[in-house]
């Protein structure tokens, strides 16, 4: 439906914001572009909209090349972070403005606005000016202005970043429900990984103008392609421990475990990734055992974050575990278990090494030698 081919965007100062991005988006799909500031996500969105002239590449919408067309001719509607409403116009006139410019009849405009206002629950605001609306109400109006145009593609440029946390959570649900009802292909830009996880059919993680990974929220979370993706998606972020692997044995904190791997791998500078919520306080089968020296406990109500140090391959390293709420003593060593199937291995280039679940075995002979 939307096909981006080898998109490059270089600014006049020589900065290349987008570096040959390829992306195919299906009809009705909700795609979220996510990444830190400067990753190129907004440049891609503005290039699709026609607000930025691309340096090279092609953009096709429904089989039609649009990168050489004016923004008004692309059949795309955009929802901005700052709402972009006309302050001197009523909500009704803001909704009607684009349709009037296209020569749509008054009767058709009234019909479209009535339908959209009912869908977005803004009927009672139609006579008000934007200044009389709350942030959430303004965002609904901005979305309504995009919807009445009946475009082939919706673009969302960090639309919730000006709202408080509670309203953001509510509006996330509103946007997701609305997109499902309308079935319009949508591209959404955010730096917030929670928005990405909750809204997207597929997430596109960007780093320095290039795509680091494309996948469903579950794929990106459970099979991150790199340490960058693993650290960016998930809160608290994934823990990383320096480890090594030799002859099929993972070496960490003076212990060895047999772990499955796809190739004959020997690596002296492996990175082991562990999600904080995968640290169990009870022995489990097919797991490695570590010892967490407790330094800080953050109670969150239903659970708590336990911050501490774990003895890694090259010294103590920071680690966070999510546990049930319970009394813990600062300075104590807390034994934790992590299932092998929940471990993430990354190579020297910080790229994922695929592994599958298999029972680990502690090399007791080496432990005995170290104890002697």
Swiss-Prot record:
Its main location: membrane. It comes from the Bacteria. It is a peripheral membrane protein. InterPro entries: AAA+_ATPase (IPR003593), ABC_transporter-like_ATP-bd (IPR003439), ABC_transporter-like_CS (IPR017871), ABC_transpr_MalK-like (IPR015855), ABC_transpr_MalK/UgpC-like (IPR047641), Mo/tungstate-bd_C_term_dom (IPR008995), NA-bd_OB-fold (IPR012340), OB_MalK-like (IPR040582). ATP binds at residues 35-42. Its EC number is 7.6.2.10. Residues 2-233 form the ABC transporter domain. It holds the Pfam family ABC_tran. It is found in: Cell inner membrane. One of its GO terms (molecular function) is ATP binding. PROSITE patterns: ABC_TRANSPORTER_1, ABC_TRANSPORTER_2, UGPC. GO terms for biological process: carbohydrate transport; glycerophosphodiester transmembrane transport. It catalyses: sn-glycerol 3-phosphate(out) + ATP + H2O = sn-glycerol 3-phosphate(in) + ADP + phosphate + H(+). Keywords: ATP-binding, Cell inner membrane, Cell membrane, Membrane, Nucleotide-binding, Sugar transport, Translocase, Transport. Transmembrane segments: none annotated. One of its GO terms (cellular component) is ATP-binding cassette (ABC) transporter complex, substrate-binding subunit-containing. The complex is composed of two ATP-binding proteins (UgpC), two transmembrane proteins (UgpA and UgpE) and a solute-binding protein (UgpB). Belongs to the ABC transporter superfamily. sn-glycerol-3-phosphate importer (TC 3.A.1.1.3) family. Part of the ABC transporter complex UgpBAEC involved in sn-glycerol-3-phosphate (G3P) import. Responsible for energy coupling to the transport system. This is sn-glycerol-3-phosphate import ATP-binding protein UgpC. It comes from Vibrio vulnificus (strain YJ016). The gene is ugpC.
